[in-house]
Design a protein with these regions (language model features):
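Short beta-strand segments
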Residues: 8, 94-96, 124-125
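Short phosphate-binding loop-to-helix
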Residues: 45, 52-109
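Short, high-confidence coil segments that cap the C-terminus of an alpha-helix
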Residues: 41, 87-89, 117-121
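Conserved core of the sugar-phosphate nucleotidyltransferase
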Residues: 104-198
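Short aromatic/basic micro-patch
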Residues: 15, 101, 186
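N-terminal glycine-rich phosphate-binding loop and ensuing alpha1 helix
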Residues: 2-48
């Protein structure tokens, strides 16, 4: 099975414009992400709509493909990149462009999900450490995931899920195993095309 890693990278972030080019230890952030991803994947590309990012990737010898500036999400950008590259990879891994310390082992783990021929989409979670307390659990920058008994994701939320009725809120982390999301998704190529064609629900913008 063939995998391709695609790193969607935008310059015009509302919270941190130019984030992919922020210098970390003498290298642009996008280079840090690219190099870490390359430790686990034979083929990695940066997908961007900005020539400044494209030039930075070319400068360190990375693969880069230009995409439209009109995409609704990084997922849509990944699909266009996959098509523009002319890739024949079976699985596309969407790698966040602001994760300079991404663990190559996690990339290997998400690839292993596709050992099951029925897997169409995969993502990763980590058990929440109760020592972080309720304050850490409530951090909206750390999305939570509710899982079923077989480990399938039921719901993603920036709020704490599930709600523990009848339990003091500060006790929640020690009374239930919560999970937080690791921002990485992998899709079989056909499934990626299918989901990007679906209309977005209003909930995604909340």
């Amino acid at each position: 099975m063939k995998f391709i890693g695609i790193i969607p990278a935008r310059y015009a972030s509302t919270r941190f414009p130019g984030k992919p080019l922020a210098i970390l230890g003498g290298k642009p952030m996008i280079q840090r992400v690219y190099e870490r991803a390359s430790l686990a994947l034979e083929e990695v590309w940066v997908a961007t709509d900005d020539t400044r990012i494209a030039d930075a990737v070319k400068a360190f010898g990375g693969n880069v493909v230009m995409t439209s500036a009109a995409h609704r999400s990084g997922t849509d950008r990944c699909l266009e990149a996959y098509r523009n590259i002319g890739s024949d990879a079976d699985v596309v891994i969407n790698i966040q462009g602001d994760e300079p310390f991404i663990d190559p082992l996690q990339l290997k783990q998400i690839q292993s999900c596709f050992d099951d021929p029925d897997t169409r989409i995969a993502t990763l979670v980590r058990p929440y450490n109760p020592e972080g307390g309720i304050e850490g659990l409530e951090n909206p920058n750390s999305p939570k995931v509710a899982l079923d008994a077989e480990g399938y994701a039921l719901l993603f939320s920036r709020s704490v899920i599930p709600y523990l009725r009848g339990v003091e809120r500060r006790e929640w982390p020690s009374r239930h195993q919560y999970y937080t999301h690791i921002g990485m998704y992998a899709y079989r190529a056909g499934t990626l095309a299918e989901i990007t064609a679906l209309p977005q629900l209003s909930l995604i913008h909340i």
